């Protein structure tokens, strides 16, 4: 399985929302706060200095993860990780996590 990790593009906003809402509905529930953040990733994550990555397979976004800044400019929280249900267990989440670790090291983040 050839999975590629790519950075956020505005046209991926709906995929970010759908992947995360599916995960939340499966394991928890979607709170109003989640709804707001997930529906506006550019405003609530990217514009605040965060990063969003996607796992793509056959030109489809099949997983996502975000790095959100904390009060420190060099410390980020890994959040909003989700993978399509039918592709879980195939190490896609692990690839997203590894990408975040390498990205953070390359940018001297904690």
What do the predicted segments below correspond to?
Residues 90:
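Flexible nucleotide-binding loop
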Residues 7-79, 84-86, 94-99, 103, ...:
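Acetyl-CoA-dependent GNAT
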Residues 110:
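Short acidic/polar active-site loop segments enriched in Thr and Asp
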Residues 2-4:
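Extreme N-terminal starter segment of soluble prokaryotic enzymes
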């Amino acid at each position: 399985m050839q999975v590629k990790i790519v950075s956020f593009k505005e046209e991926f906003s709906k995929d970010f929302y759908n992947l995360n809402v599916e995960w939340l509905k499966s394991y928890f529930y979607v709170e109003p706060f989640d709804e707001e953040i997930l529906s506006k990733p550019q405003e609530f994550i990217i514009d605040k200095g965060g990063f969003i990555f996607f796992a793509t397979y056959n030109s489809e976004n099949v997983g996502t993860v975000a790095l959100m800044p904390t009060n420190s400019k060099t410390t980020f929280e890994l959040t909003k990780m989700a993978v399509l249900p039918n592709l879980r267990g195939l190490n896609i989440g692990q690839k997203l996590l590894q990408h975040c670790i390498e990205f953070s090291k390359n940018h001297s983040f904690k």
